[in-house]
Amino acid sequence: MAEEPTYTAEQVNDVVHAGLGTVDFFLSRPVDGQSSLGKGSVPPGITAVLTNAAELKAKTAAAAPVKPKRKKIQHMTPAYTIADNGDPNRLPANTPIANPLIPIERPPGRMTDLDLATGTVTQGTYKGVELAKAGKNALLTRFSSGPSLTDQASSKDPNFKRGGEIDGRHKGRHRREWSIAWVGDEVKVYEWCNPTCAPVTATDRKFSCTCGTCPDRCGECEGDN
């Protein structure tokens, strides 16, 4: 058996004093629980274990894979344009004024204009004028308990609703459709024809016949442009 090493009292005192010095050094400094001990923070002496542990931890952290940072996705949101409330008479000639109720492109049809202030009808058809007047009354009495636009129109024509009911078997013909909008002080009524086999949509759109029996022109759309 190997003989156990023996230490003199002087050697034991040196080891104890070195250990106490290391403890006093760290107790006299603020301790951050999330940080590791660097090699430079370890005082000289019998501290080989602490030094090796600090170096091993530093090497492990350096060798760890670096996670790539996620790029922030920027959504391409179109900018909004706020309309100017200035006098429209001061705008340059032919300045287009956007209105969500009036599409830029329309199918062939007719426009009826009714001035709310004077009651003057610029152009249009009999049906368009009746609808424009009903639209004017609805605009002026929309906060009252009077009859609604639907009641006024349907009382004169039961088939006022676009795509009114067709009795019996389907026959190829046209269906008159209308679109009402308020622009400034005017009521604009736009009308056009669609084949009865076409669907009824919320947009001003011209459909083609799918049943093969609807005519290309009818008595109502002969004057459309």
UniProtKB/Swiss-Prot annotation:
Residues 145-157 have a biased composition (Polar residues). InterPro entries: Paramyx_V_Zn-bd, Soyouz_module. Residues 145-172 are annotated as: Disordered. GO terms for molecular function: metal ion binding. GO terms for cellular component: host cell cytoplasm. The keyword Zinc applies. Zn(2+) 2 binds at residues 197, 209, 211, 214. Zn(2+) 1 binds at residues 174, 193, 218, 221. It is found in: Host cytoplasm. GO terms for biological process: symbiont-mediated suppression of host cytoplasmic pattern recognition receptor signaling pathway via inhibition of MDA-5 activity; symbiont-mediated suppression of host JAK-STAT cascade via inhibition of STAT1 activity; symbiont-mediated suppression of host type I interferon-mediated signaling pathway. It holds the Pfam family Soyouz_module. Keywords: Host cytoplasm, Host-virus interaction, Inhibition of host innate immune response by virus, Inhibition of host interferon signaling pathway by virus, Inhibition of host MDA5 by virus, Inhibition of host RLR pathway by virus, Inhibition of host STAT1 by virus, Interferon antiviral system evasion, Metal-binding, Viral immunoevasion, Zinc. Residues 158-169 have a biased composition (Basic and acidic residues). Plays an essential role in the inhibition of host immune response. Prevents the establishment of cellular antiviral state by blocking interferon-alpha/beta (IFN-alpha/beta) production and signaling pathway. Interacts with host IFIH1/MDA5 and DHX58/LGP2 to inhibit the transduction pathway involved in the activation of IFN-beta promoter, thus protecting the virus against cell antiviral state. Efficiently blocks type I and type II IFN signaling following infection, probably by targeting host STAT1 for proteasomal degradation. Belongs to the paramyxoviruses V protein family. This is Non-structural protein V. It comes from Simian virus 41. The lineage of its organism: Viruses, Riboviria, Orthornavirae, Negarnaviricota, Haploviricotina.
